Each structure stands twice: as structure tokens, then as C-alpha cells.
Amino acid sequence: MLACLYTSFEHSNSVYTECSRTSLNQKSVLYPGGDNMKLQEKNYATAALNFERPQDALKLALLKLKENQWDNTMQALIDIVHISRLQPELIDSIMPIVNRSICSLLRNIRSNVVRTACQVAAELFRTMQCTQRPEFDELVGMLLQKTGDMNRCIRQDANSALDTMADFIPASHCVRVMSTSRGAGHKNPLVRATVSRLLNYIVTLKGVDTLFSTTATKDTRGRVFIMCAKFLVDGNCETRANARSLVKLLMTHSDFEHLFHQDVDRKLTEKIQKQLITLKYDAPSGSRIISK
């Protein structure tokens, strides 16, 4: 029975020969991942399989994970994805192990292994929505790092996984990891551009009013403001453009100015004061995302 599951993995190898042909500068605001998700759908085209005994399939997958061999780990994670779609409650208790295994594949030197790890991460963000720390933080940090990879296909898959994270994981968890040195403080400009794009997308998706609505979002709002302020003076033009777009969106709320100056360091606000004034009196426009 398990042999038939591995045929889905063998079938998926063909999709590694080329990336999505969609231009990286033509992603929509509503779904920045664009056509990248088509690759993932092909990769799990045969995922809708029924297990007669999913518990036994899970035990076998765990044994493969313990072997700590990249090929067995990859096959085990694909099986776990299948199980998570049928009986996600079986996977809950082992998600820390699963996320650590995904991270181990993300460190692999083989591009097809890394791409599979990105796609597995995306599927588990969708089905499990697990935010247990520190494994969740480690996984998101590694996916962010892969958005700066030299391999274009890996960049696309990592971005698609992060798009799925933004769709299914609470904003507070996403923003917390993105605000660290693995995200907004990363030395790679491509990673910072990804963070600015995701930040724009998350605020657009959740709504500006939600960000300003309750005291429960105070920490998240503060992180968003600080990242916006730093991105306005970033050395990367895409990062700056995304930050300007996001600040203009945030300025539509009546409490923005008061709360922004309350949460952001005074020296930083003075540094970007001219830009804030320009954005405030600039002609209003929709949120525009410079994509990966």
C-alpha cells in the first residue's frame, strides 16, 4: 500500500526540470505566490489517497525519520503530508519532529530535496497550522533564507511556502519571526525584500482595522511599524517600494500617526520624517507589492 504513495514522489520528479514561467514581477496583491502554487499542486497530484490503517503508515514514516537519511526522510515527509490531509490529529503530537526533519532537508545540497522540503512545509502550514516553538521559528527562518538562494526555483518554492504561511498562520506568529535577524535584519537584500512583500500581504489580507483594533495586537503592530520604518531607508529598491506602499495603506487609519510615533524610536522617526510627510500628502493608491 505504501508503495503506491511513493509513486507520487517519483511522478513529482519531472516537475523539477523547470520553474513556473510566470514573471516574478506580475504577482497579484491578493495572492503574491501567483502560479508558483501550480508546481506544488502537481507535486502532490496523487495525494488524495486513502489509508486503510493511517496509524501504521505514520509509524513507518516515523521510523524512516529516525534513520536520518535524506532520501528516507523525504519519502516519510510526503507520507506525513498525505496523512495530515486525512487525519491531521494523528500528526499534532509529532509536529516538532516533523518540522526539524523539514529543516534538515532545507540544509541539503540537492536542489530537488530542498524544493520538496519547501513544498512539504507549505502543505503542513495549510493542514496543521502548527506554531510550536522553537521549531516553527527555525523553519520559517530557513524558508526566509532560501528566498535569497541562487537557485531561482528554490526561491520560488520558498516564497510560495511563506505565502501559504501568511494565509493559514496567525499574523502575530508570522510577524514575530519576520522581525528577527532571520528576516527584517537579514544581510541578504532578497530576504529583506521578501519580508517587506510578506508584511504588505499580511496587512492587506488581515485588514488595517484588525491591526489597530485591540490591545492584543499591540506587539504585532509595533513590530510592523518598526519594520516599515527601517525598510523605508533600506538599500534595496524593492524593499523601499514595498515599505512605501504599506505605510500609505496604514496611513488610512486615523490612529496611525499617534501610534506610529509611540511605537517607533524617535531617532528613527526623525530619519524618515520627510518620507512620511511625502507619503501622507501623496495621491492615494492601492497597496502595490513588488514581488519576488
Annotate each PLM feature.
Residues 1-292:
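Extended, low-complexity, acidic/polar intrinsically disordered regions
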